[in-house]
Amino acid sequence: MEEDDHGGKHDALSALSQWLWSKPLGQHNADLDDDEEVTTGQEELFLPEEQAQARHLFSRKTISREVPADESRSGRVYQTAQHSLMEYSRPTMSIKSRWSFWSSSPKPLPKTPVPSLTSWTHTVNSTPFPQLSTSSGSQSPGKRRLQRLTSMERNGTTLPRTNSGSSTKAMVLHR
């Protein structure tokens, strides 16, 4: 996740936001009757046990504008744009997720929560491995067999997963 590469993605999101906000509704005097709220943030996470890093950029902008009564019974319109860009990478995997949300309403909309990077990386780490089909009996010569491993305590019970960033599952290749 290079800084230069990430900057281009952020510029594309900014261009989309600027386009959305260049389409005002109704006749209004922005200096007198607009209310604006902007939230931006950046999260970064490094998990040394997994040699993984994650980054999350997000922004939310809400504008409340006065409009003629024929456009909105409340006399106001509320516009919201949200953008989120998440990246997760480690030596064997790279995941990118991007979403945008835009709404316009005559009533204030409830704020939707911005996704958290820590909850997203927990989802990535806890994604189960696909079930492997193994035949009972002998294995053909030259074929490899994958075995799913799970960390166990001494009494044979599976260790609970935590959000510490350490993974308790692994795949081992047997020849």
UniProtKB/Swiss-Prot annotation:
InterPro entries: Luteo_VPG
Domain comment as written in the entry: The N-terminus is involved in homodimerization. The C-terminus binds ssRNA. The C-terminus is phosphorylated.
Keywords: Host cell junction, Host Golgi apparatus, Phosphoprotein, Transport, Viral movement protein
Record's compositionally biased regions (Polar residues): 115-141, 148-169
Biased composition (Basic and acidic residues): 63-74
CC terms in the record's Gene Ontology section: host cell Golgi apparatus; host cell plasmodesma
Family as reported in the entry's similarity comment: Belongs to the polerovirus movement protein family.
Signal peptide (UniProt feature, chain positions): none
Subcellular location: Host cell junction, Host plasmodesma; Host Golgi apparatus
Entries under Pfam families matching the protein: Luteo_Vpg
Location of region: Homodimerization: 30-47
Role noted for this protein: Together with movement protein P3a, facilitates long-distance movement of virions in host. Transports viral genome to neighboring plant cells directly through plasmosdesmata, without any budding. The movement protein allows efficient cell to cell propagation, by bypassing the host cell wall barrier. Binds ssRNA.
Record keyword ATP-binding present: no
Post-translational modifications reported in the UniProt record: Phosphorylated.
Principal location listed in the UniProt entry: host cell
One Gene Ontology biological process: transport of virus in host, cell to cell
Sequence positions bearing Phosphoserine: S64, S133
Region (RNA-binding): 50-156
Subunit record text: Homodimer.
Record's miscellaneous remark: Poleroviruses are transmitted by aphids directly into phloem tissue. The virus replicates most efficiently in phloem companion cells and then moves through plasmodesmata between companion cells or into sieve elements for long distance transport.
Protein name stated in the entry: Movement protein
Organism: Beet western yellows virus (isolate GB1)
Domain of life: Viruses
Region (Disordered): 58-89, 103-175
